[in-house]
Design a protein with these regions (language model features):
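Conserved, structured core segments of small domains
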Residues: 1-105
Length: 105
């Protein structure tokens, strides 16, 4: 069964950082979702901080729509992995998830 990379976009706002209670609530929602995915979760992953996009022209800030984090899951097909991503509770709040099959090396 192939591994798939979930790349989370959104959630990088210029609002004040969340309170510890807000962070816990968000983490509880995410962990509940991972719990529903069960053994298909290979790596929960981690959130990311704002970064830079590097090209021949130089480096520029990624901005609020940059990568917000990643996870790795197992699925039988890209379609199944996409359906798993669609079930994420933050999709309703505007988060986007790009899904990529990870090629074995």
């Amino acid at each position: 069964m192939p591994n798939y990379l979930f790349v989370y976009y959104g959630g990088m706002s210029e609002a004040p950082p969340p309170t510890p209670a807000q962070q816990k609530k968000t983490m509880d929602v995410w962990m509940g979702w991972f719990g529903k995915l069960g053994k298909t979760v290979v790596e929960i992953g981690a959130p990311t901080k704002p970064g830079k996009t590097v090209s021949k022209a130089g480096a520029r800030a990624t901005g609020k729509d940059g990568v917000a984090g990643y996870s790795i899951v197992k699925a039988n097909s890209l379609g199944q992995a996409v359906n798993m991503a669609k079930s994420h509770p933050d999709i309703a709040q505007g988060m986007k998830i790009a899904v990529y099959e990870i090629m074995p090396m």
